[in-house]
Amino acid sequence: GNQIAMVFQDPMMTLNPVLRIDTQMIEAIRAHESLNRNEARQRARDALGQVGIPSPDERLKAYPHQFSGGMRQRVSIAIALLNKPDLIIADEPTTALDVTIQAQILHEVQKLCQETGTALIWITHDLSVIAGLADDVAVMYAGRIVEYGEVDNVLDRPMHPYTFGLIGSVPSRNRRGAPLHQIPGMTPSLLNLPRGCAFRTRCPQAVDLCGTAPEVSEPRGSGRLIRCHSPMSPAGLTTELPGISAS
């Protein structure tokens, strides 16, 4: 759309398998703008070039099954960029791409957001992507946001025990050979969440009060929102964490 665009993890949720790529891209453009077919085709060609698809003129004539999984994902990202939307929601869109193309697409998305003022919600498990891409980060556990703040504050000085464990489980070149932190237990079923805080059965900071659902609070001087009865102190934690930093 021209207001909100979605990039799915599986590109086949975006692409119609029986239509050529140019048909799908031109249709997406002309549904929102009064462009002739040649103008729309040129914009579609430029979008494919933006996401690193070689020979875009020829690839426009192809069908989705003629692309690899990574190439199909690039096409779906190009479709999302076509109409310069106000908001892009991206659900792990670079999972199937190699590191070089991933970096290129992240650069193009950043450039688009800076030039047009487009807001971006990037859903991912890759903290290195978040560190390099995001201004703010929301950490979710069992379907709820447990910590939210500026990306450098949260990744460098986590306060929620789950955030701390999540960052500690990422390999770091600064701690080569050292054992990774492990969060004990298993993620609970959303159909049978424990009473109170959903993380309390796995949490090293758990107290009796965690049996009641925590409210969102903003600890003084922390620069973030947190949903926790027993948060960790942010002071001095950076030396224990892997080398992930937004700075």
Model-derived regions: residue spans:
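Interfacial catalytic loop of ABC nucleotide-binding domains
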Residues: 2, 10, 58-63, 178
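Short catalytic/signature loops enriched in Gly
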Residues: 54-60, 148-247
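ABC-type ATPase nucleotide-binding domains, specifically the catalytic core motifs of the NBD
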Residues: 21-39, 49-54, 66, 149
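A short, proline-enriched helix->beta-strand linker immediately N-terminal to the Walker B motif
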Residues: 82-86
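Conserved ABC ATPase signature
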Residues: 62-67, 71
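ABC nucleotide-binding domain "signature" region
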Residues: 39-51, 165-169
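P-loop NTP-binding/switch modules centered on Walker-like glycine-rich loops
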Residues: 89-93, 97-178
